[in-house]
């Protein structure tokens, strides 16, 4: 997860961008922080999806094949 300070900085830069504008350095910093945030968000979301198993009313595993393949690839990549 992104540190609290980085999230606060993202919000500070967004607020300033709407009011007074940002310098070139601040725009680069904002872009870098946003990319880092999105990357961590996506990884967290993937981790959540890899812990999901879909079952029907009868208790049968009906997890989509694409998700099963992604889980297997993820497990093989980390081991």
Swiss-Prot record:
Pfam families: DUF896 (PF05979). Gene3D superfamilies: Helix hairpin bin (1.10.287.540). InterPro entries: DUF896 (IPR009242). It is found in: Cytoplasm. One of its GO terms (cellular component) is cytoplasm. Its main location: cytoplasm. Residues 57-79 are annotated as: Disordered. Residues 63-79 have a biased composition (Basic and acidic residues). The keyword Transport does not apply. Keywords: Cytoplasm. Belongs to the UPF0291 family. This is UPF0291 protein BH2353. It comes from Halalkalibacterium halodurans (strain ATCC BAA-125 / DSM 18197 / FERM 7344 / JCM 9153 / C-125).
